[in-house]
């Protein structure tokens, strides 16, 4: 048996990113500064949004959004069972209560009927998750929250301005995806993105938040609120304080420390230059996979439809009729051949943290059935066409061996 060396998701870093980081290191300004501001401006151009705030993670971006919205004790936020913990843990960080809903049968998206049923007078936000870069059905989500406006009770300035449950998209996987011709970022009320090392677009660690144009929002004031929350509650960042006579500042809230550095932003600036071609390569690999698995028991989530186009972050497959044990055996056998696979994700109610909060997987049968048969294959821009063929052939062979034709 031949042993390969195909990692799951290594970063794609060129000499361009390296040189840009060196330039920043030599510039004398390495924390939040001109390159972070430039990345924010360019990301807003890319997503067709009024402003972007870059932070040190998508998790921070999501939590700060809940804070800016004034969500806290006594409030409820709805999240799907099929997501990573970050989508949910931030709700507890903010002092609110998570309401976890099941996904729809034979789907990765939340059950929108269950979403409607879960909205109460205490609901302040819903966090849809664009899993694998595949946009949720935002028309349906907005239809649901609009239909429940009569229940909504605002208790903060931005809640008043929205006048309904906020749609706060976890777009960690979805930078570059589109929904009905609109870039993700300009669809939900607020959208957070991840720039973690394994993401399509990386700053090593990092993330951002943006929002769609809203006539009730003062974009500069909203941007300033995020800045204050992200830097200890301080009214000026380090760059602003360097201006002559500008040392004076105030601390207006006991805030966080989650700003992005110019070193990280330097990576992002070059990544953004390269991003269109990186997305093209991902689409090409997805097409090769789809063709290779035709006529087998292996099915994949669809990255394109009449209403959306995914940025192709993950290639998520389901192996028809596989048991939990067989799924594990397939992943081990792939690893023995040097091909790294993953699972996205364990449903939240299967995790100890959420079991301890009273969630029971028996109440989430669709999420569990989705999870049991799921295997994620390598999908990254350092894969060669030859390696894609190797993955296809070995995966098909192992699935047939373990589960049958």
What do these predicted regions represent?
Residues 29-76, 90-92, 100, 149-153:
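Phosphate-binding glycine-rich loop
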Residues 89-91, 183, 263:
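Hydrophobic/aromatic ligand-binding patch that stacks against planar heteroaromatic rings
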Residues 53, 78, 99, 166-168, ...:
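Structural detector of well-ordered beta-strand residues that form the stable sheet scaffold
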Residues 155-202, 247-251, 299:
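Conserved active-site segment immediately N-terminal to the catalytic lysine
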Residues 67, 71-171, 178:
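PLP-dependent aminotransferase-like
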Residues 173, 186-236, 262:
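Active-site PLP attachment segment
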């Amino acid at each position: 048996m031949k042993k390969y060396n195909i990692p799951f998701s290594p970063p794609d870093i060129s000499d361009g990113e390296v040189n840009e980081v060196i330039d920043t290191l030599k510039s004398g300004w390495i924390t939040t500064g001109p390159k972070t501001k430039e990345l924010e401006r360019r990301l807003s151009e890319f997503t067709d949004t009024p402003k972007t705030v870059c932070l040190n993670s998508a998790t921070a971006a999501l939590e700060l959004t809940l804070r800016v919205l004034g969500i806290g004790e006594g409030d409820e936020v709805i999240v799907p069972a099929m997501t990573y913990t970050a989508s949910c843990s931030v709700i507890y960080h903010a002092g609110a209560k998570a309401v976890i809903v099941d996904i729809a049968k034979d789907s990765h998206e939340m059950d929108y009927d269950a979403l409607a049923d879960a909205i109460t007078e205490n609901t302040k936000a819903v966090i849809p998750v664009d899993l694998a870069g595949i946009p949720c059905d935002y028309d349906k989500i907005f239809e649901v929250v609009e239909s429940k406006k009569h229940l909504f009770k605002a208790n903060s300035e931005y809640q008043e301005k929205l006048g309904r449950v906020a749609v706060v998209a976890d777009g960690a996987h979805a930078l570059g995806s589109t929904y009905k011709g609109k870039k993700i970022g300009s669809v939900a009320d607020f959208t957070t993105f991840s720039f973690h090392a394994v993401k399509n677009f990386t700053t090593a660690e990092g993330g951002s938040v943006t929002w769609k144009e809203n006539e009730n929002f003062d974009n500069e004031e909203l941007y300033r609120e995020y800045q204050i929350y992200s830097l200890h509650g301080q009214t000026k960042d380090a760059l602003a304080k360097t201006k002559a006579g500008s040392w004076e500042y105030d601390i207006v809230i006991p805030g966080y420390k989650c700003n992005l550095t110019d070193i990280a932003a330097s990576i992002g600036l070059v990544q953004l230059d390269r991003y269109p071609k990186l997305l093209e390569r991902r689409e090409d690999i997805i097409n090769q996979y789809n063709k290779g698995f035709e006529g087998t028991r292996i099915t994949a989530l669809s990255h394109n439809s009449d209403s959306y186009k995914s940025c192709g972050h993950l290639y998520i497959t389901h192996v028809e009729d596989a048991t939990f044990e067989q799924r594990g055996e397939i992943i081990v056998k792939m690893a023995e051949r040097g091909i790294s696979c993953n699972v996205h994700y364990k449903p939240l109610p299967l995790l100890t943290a959420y079991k301890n909060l009273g969630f029971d997987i028996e109440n989430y049968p669709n999420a569990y059935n989705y999870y049991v048969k799921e295997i994620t294959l390598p999908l990254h821009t350092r894969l060669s066409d030859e390696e894609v063929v190797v993955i296809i052939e070995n995966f098909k062979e192992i699935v047939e061996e373990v589960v049958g034709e």
